[in-house]
Amino acid sequence: NVELYVGSELDTGQILEFGFQNICIATGAGWRADGVSRQHVVPIPADAAMPVYTPDDIMAGRLPKGRVVIYDDDHYYMGGVMAELLAQQGCDVTLVTPAPYVSDWTRNTLEQHAIHRRLVLAGVRIVLNRGVTALLADGVETNCSYTDMREVTPCDAVVIVGSRRSHDALYHDLMARQAEW
C-alpha cells in the first residue's frame, strides 16, 4: 500500500514517527540563478548591478522590464516559454543559447519549428550557437560556441534558464538518521 501526503511538509522527526519501511521523497528543485548549466560547471562571473531572474521568479510574477536577455542552456521548452511570455509582457527579448536550435530538445517531439516560429512572430531576437560568459552591469558578454569570439549584448535584466538545484535537505537529514529507521 502507498500513502501520499501531497502538499504537506514534514520534517525528519515527523517522517520517522510514521515508522515507514520505505520512504519516497519528492521535494522538487529550484532553478539556479548563478548560470551553472551545460556550458558552465561553476557560476558565471556576474556584476551585482545586473538584475538576474530565473523561471521560478517569472512564474511567481516577478517580471523584468525593458531589454531582457534570456540565457537558455537547458535546451528543453522553458527558455522558449520564458521568451514568449516576456515578449507578450512588452519586454524587448533576446534569447541566447549555445545550441544550434531554440529549445533544441523539442526537435525530438517535433515542436521545435513551431516554437521558433512563435518566437520570431513575437519579436524575440534569437541568437544561436552563443553562450554567456559574464553578466556585466549593463549587458551580457557572449561567446561563439565554435570560436569563443566574444561580444557584448546590452540589456537591463537577464533570465537564466540553466540547471536546477534539488531541494534535498530533507533527504540528507533522513540519511543522517538512518540508524533510526
Question: What spans do the regions from the language model cover?
Answer:
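Glycine-rich phosphate/pyrophosphate-binding loop
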Residues: 36-37
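Glycine-rich loop(s) and the adjacent beta-strand/alpha-helix scaffold that form part
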Residues: 52, 179-181
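Iron-sulfur cluster-binding electron-transfer modules in prokaryotic oxidoreductases
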Residues: 57-59, 77-78
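Rossmann-like NAD(P)H-binding beta-loop-alpha module
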Residues: 65-93
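Short boundary/hinge segments that flank catalytic cores
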Residues: 41-43
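A Rossmann-like FAD-binding core segment of flavoenzymes
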Residues: 1-33, 46-49, 57, 63-64, ...
